[in-house]
UniProtKB/Swiss-Prot annotation:
Region forming the signal peptide: none
Family: Belongs to the methyltransferase superfamily. RNA methyltransferase RsmG family.
Cellular compartment(s): Cytoplasm
The enzyme's E.C. designation: 2.1.1.170
UniProt-recorded name of the protein: Ribosomal RNA small subunit methyltransferase G
Keyword set, alphabetical order: Cytoplasm, Methyltransferase, rRNA processing, S-adenosyl-L-methionine, Transferase
Length: 230
């Protein structure tokens, strides 16, 4: 199934993901904030704005459906979050779940903090940092929306992961190719789910097993430095 219209997208959130009225209200407010801010800085491509519920809200929220985690309490880490997708959407739906949003661009992190404040999302932490400089830690889920090639992403981010950490990585049309570029011994740890918002796009889902860190073919990064918080 591929969602096409804004009506279909909102119906899917309510009927399939069972998003409650309070969360739907927060998502609608987020859309309004995004549309206003996009006039000041290019958060998302203008061509996607007429389909913002499909292209950004459901495209983010589907990670909860793909992971079968419609509820959860473990901290979620969203790397290279940009305009807050998927992390800000996750936080709006699961408002009791801690969500950390990381981006290296000050304008983006300032916007994220303003949006989180406007939505009264006390579960959101915004960090201004490159991923390589971010303080290590263990997270329940890690997302990154088209942030970096899979092998590089795993190399620089494995230190945020345990064998129980769920990775949810929207990758567009190149998802299967990126997975195949990993050594064959890694393939069983990840699989590709089809996106609900684009029939050509895939989401890489899986867990890193113990002893499989960092990712192959990429050198270990220098010791991390603690990132700045906004």
């Amino acid at each position: 199934m591929t969602l096409v219209t804004e009506v279909e997208a909102q119906a899917w959130l309510r009927e399939v993901l069972h998003v409650d009225d309070a969360s739907m209200s927060r998502l609608a407010h987020l859309v309004d904030l995004l549309l206003a801010e996009n006039e000041r800085q290019n958060l998302v491509a203008r061509g996607t704005l007429p389909h913002v519920w499909v292209r950004h809200i459901v495209d983010s929220a589907q990670l909860l459906h793909v992971s079968r985690e419609t509820s959860g309490s473990g901290e979620w880490l969203d790397l290279g979050t940009g305009a807050g997708f998927p992390g800000l959407v996750i936080a709006a739906i699961q408002s009791d779940r801690p969500v950390t949003l990381v981006d290296s661009r000050r304008l983006r992190t300032e916007w994220l903090q303003r949006a989180a404040d406007a939505l009264e999302l006390s579960n959101v932490r915004v960090i201004l940092s490159r991923v390589e400089d971010l303080e290590s830690g263990a997270y329940a889920a890690i997302s990154a929306r088209a942030f970096a090639p899979l092998d590089k992403l795993l190399a620089i981010s494995a230190r945020f992961s345990t064998p129980d950490t769920l990775w949810l990585l929207p990758k567009g049309a190149g998802a299967q190719h990126e997975l195949q570029m990993l050594p064959e011994s890694w393939h069983h740890m990840f699989h590709v789910e089809q996106s609900l918002t684009d029939p050509a796009a895939g989401i890489i889902v899986g867990r890193l097993l113990a002893g499989k860190q960092p990712a192959p073919h990429v050198s270990r990064q220098q010791a991390p430095r603690k990132g700045k918080r906004t």
